[in-house]
Amino acid sequence: MPRPAAQVPVLEVSRLRIAREAKVILRGLSWRVEPGQHWVILGPNGSGKSSLLAALTGYFAPTSGTLAVLGETFGRSDWRELRRRIGLVGPSVAAMIQPAEPALAVVAGGVDGLINLWRRPKPATLALARRLLRLLKVGGLAARPWGHLSQGERQRVLIARALASDPALLILDESCAGLDPVARAEFLVLVKRLPKLKPGLAIVFVTHHIEEILPVFTHALLLRNGSALAAGRMADVLKPAALSKLFGRKVRLTKGRAGWSLDVAGK
């Protein structure tokens, strides 16, 4: 009997394996994200985070296992249509935007998952784009070319673009990379607001920095060498023993008013 629509998971991965030539990138990963959950994917460089995201967005075909996003199974559905229901913020999107593209056009393109628009969007689309830019506190940048935006401004514009299609899932891929300390702090404040800006939105935040994990995140997936070391509620997963195994060094984990911090024991 089919599962009721309200209970369909946002993501459901079962024994997912990705290999290219002789290299195994993901090793039998199983993972599930329910509507409204806010996940962190934490892992060192080379752990398989980028390959997992590429698979989730249909750009990397699994070698074996099953992958379902918003009830659609990879290999049985049109992933091009599905991408419109997934908001993606990350370097892969930013790299495709032409320097001359105005911020307003960048956001407007998010409605249909397009980049570098070649014709003027409909008035309703432009109105939505302006509203989202204002919501993200960059309404005054609508006419500014992409190439003239700071890194922090670009991240806000990209989030506005990602929200333009009214997604059920928002993926933030290493979104703090390249930000100076002030811009990073401001960006994390924005991330903290996202659940209120769009209630019910499932969020996947990818990082290898423990200090970027905010209280709004409810769950964590720890990835190392293509395998899941742990996955579940934050309180059950984010523990010194698991993080020591994740990073290959004994670590101390502390949580203060400013958030989490990680120290290598014996430094």
Give names to the regions the model predicted:
Residues 220-233:
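H-loop (His-switch) and adjacent beta-strand-loop-beta switch element
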Residues 145-149:
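Conserved ABC ATPase signature
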Residues 57:
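Helix-to-loop junction immediately C-terminal to a conserved catalytic motif
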Residues 65-75, 82:
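Conserved ABC transporter NBD signature motif
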Residues 123-141:
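Conserved ABC ATPase "signature" region
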Residues 170-174:
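Catalytic Walker B motif of ABC-type/P-loop ATPase nucleotide-binding domains
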